[in-house]
C-alpha cells in the first residue's frame, strides 16, 4: 500500500512540476520588471533628493532675506528712537513745568468724562429697569424685589401690631395699669396676668 502511495505521490508531483516551473519563470519575469522598477525608483529618488536640496536652499535663502530685512528695519527703528530721544530730552526738561501739570489735567479730564459716561449708562439702565417694573414687564430680579417688599411689609405690620398692643396696654386699654415684665412672660405662655 505504501508503494501505491509513493507512485501516486510521484505521479502527482511530476504532474505539478511543469506548472511550478511555469510559475517560477513568471516569477523571474516579474523579478526583472521589479529590478527595472527599482532602477526607475533610484532615479526618482535621486531626482527627489535634488529637488529637496534645491527646495531647502530656497527656504534658507528666503529665511536669510526676510531675517536680514527685519534686522535692518529694527536697527533703523532703534537709531530713530535714539535720535528722537536726543532731540526731545532737552525740550522735555525745559517744558516739564508746563507739560506735567497739563498732562495731569488732561488725565483728570479724561477720567472725569469716562466716569460720567459710565454713571450715565448706569443711570439709564436703572431708569429702564424701573420703567419696565412699573409697567409690569417683570424685568430680571423683580421677583426678588417683590419677595423683599413682602417680607418688609410683614415686618412693618408686625411692628405696628406690637406698638398698638403695648400702647393700649400702657394707656389702660385693658382696664389696668401694667408694669411690664410679668405680662410679657404670661403673654408668651398664652395666659393673662390679673392683679
Swiss-Prot record:
Q: Does this entry carry the keyword Electron transport?
A: no
InterPro entries documented for this protein: Oleosin (IPR000136)
**Major subcellular location class:** other
Where does the record locate the signal sequence feature?
Answer: none
Q: Does the keyword Cell membrane apply?
A: no
Q: Where is the composition biased (Basic and acidic residues)?
A: 180-189
Q: How does it sit in the membrane?
A: Multi-pass membrane protein
Give the start-end ranges of region Disordered: 169-195
Indicate the transmembrane segments per the record: 68-88, 90-110, 111-131
Record Pfam families: Oleosin (PF01277)
Q: Supply the PROSITE patterns for this chain.
A: OLEOSINS
Location of the region described as Hydrophobic in the Swiss-Prot/TrEMBL record: 60-131
| Gene Ontology BP, a term | reproductive structure development
Where is it localised?
A: Lipid droplet; Membrane
Q: Which UniProt keywords apply?
A: Lipid droplet, Membrane, Repeat, Transmembrane, Transmembrane helix
Which Cys pairs are S-S linked?
none
Q: Which GO terms describe its cellular component?
A: membrane; monolayer-surrounded lipid storage body
Q: Where are the sequence repeats?
A: 19-28, 29-38, 39-48
Annotated region (Polar), positions in chain: 1-59
Function as written in the Swiss-Prot or TrEMBL entry:
May have a structural role to stabilize the lipid body during desiccation of the seed by preventing coalescence of the oil. Probably interacts with both lipid and phospholipid moieties of lipid bodies. May also provide recognition signals for specific lipase anchorage in lipolysis during seedling growth.
Q: Which family does it belong to?
A: Belongs to the oleosin family.
Q: State the protein's name.
A: Oleosin Bn-III
> Could you tell me which species this protein originates from?
Brassica napus
Amino acid at each position: 500500500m505504501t508503494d501505491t502511495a509513493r507512485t501516486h505521490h510521484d505521479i502527482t508531483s511530476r504532474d505539478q512540476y511543469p506548472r511550478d516551473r511555469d510559475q517560477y519563470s513568471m516569477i523571474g519575469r516579474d523579478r526583472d520588471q521589479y529590478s527595472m522598477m527599482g532602477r526607475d525608483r533610484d532615479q526618482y529618488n535621486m531626482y527627489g533628493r535634488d529637488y529637496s536640496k534645491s527646495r531647502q536652499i530656497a527656504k534658507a535663502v528666503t529665511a536669510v532675506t526676510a531675517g536680514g530685512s527685519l534686522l535692518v528695519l529694527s536697527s533703523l527703528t532703534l537709531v530713530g528712537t535714539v535720535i528722537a530721544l536726543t532731540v526731545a530730552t532737552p525740550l522735555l526738561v525745559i517744558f516739564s513745568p508746563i507739560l506735567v501739570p497739563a498732562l495731569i489735567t488732561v488725565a483728570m479730564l479724561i477720567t472725569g468724562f469716562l466716569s460720567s459716561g459710565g454713571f450715565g449708562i448706569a443711570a439709564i439702565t436703572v431708569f429702564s429697569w424701573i420703567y419696565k417694573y412699573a409697567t409690569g414687564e417683570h424685568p430680571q430680579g423683580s421677583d426678588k424685589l417683590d419677595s423683599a417688599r413682602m417680607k418688609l411689609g410683614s415686618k412693618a405690620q408686625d411692628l405696628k401690631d406690637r406698638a398698638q398692643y403695648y400702647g393700649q396696654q400702657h394707656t389702660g386699654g385693658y382696664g389696668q395699669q401694667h408694669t411690664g415684665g410679668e405680662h410679657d412672660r404670661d403673654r408668651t405662655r398664652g395666659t393673662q396676668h390679673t392683679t
